[in-house]
Amino acid sequence: MSKTELIKRYILFVISLFFAALGVAFTKHGELGVSPISSVANVLSDKFTFLSLGTWLVIWNCVLIVGQILLLRKNFQPIQLLQVPLSFLFGWFTDFGMWIMSFIPADTYPLRLVMVFVGIVVLGFGISLAVIANVIMNSGEAFVKAAADITKKDFGNVKIAFDILCVIIALILSLVFFNFTVVGIREGTVLSAVLTGIVVKFFNAVLQKPLDKILCGKSPR
């Protein structure tokens, strides 16, 4: 891979972070629950409001990075430490997205549902760009891969288990912090879990060839 192509891929990855963060902001603005992987940070941001959602996402991502190190130990590749600054960038993008959302009304249930669906599409678009960039995984996906490698289990199955675990942790935190009330986990969480993968596959099919041409400087064979 040439230096120029590598730079292009990292630029695309940064762009993917922006859209993924914007997708999170849309779903958060809908107040019907966020994606499973963001649900823990979402509940914590609702309880401890002195820190923004973006900041809690940075903290959660760093926890997942530490988890990777503990799982992989000597097999953890130093290049993966790039996840740390990229997590901070993702958090900043999320807070910027929340600022944008402050100008968009979502005061009725239909509008909130629209926010969720738009968020899922935008999030899926961002994830697709990250997949096509193919330079570094986000901390959530990297943690799942580490767990899959250690347990010798299928990545897809581990991803499902991880999403369920995130929701369970968020649910426990919600019950503890909000007097046995479920906060931040709603139909939007379920919709995100079910539909995001479908959206990612759609965008992969549409964008893979044209973006490969841009990244590689020639039409893929």
Give short role names for the model-derived ranges.
Residues 1-221:
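Core subunits and conserved enzymes of cellular information-processing
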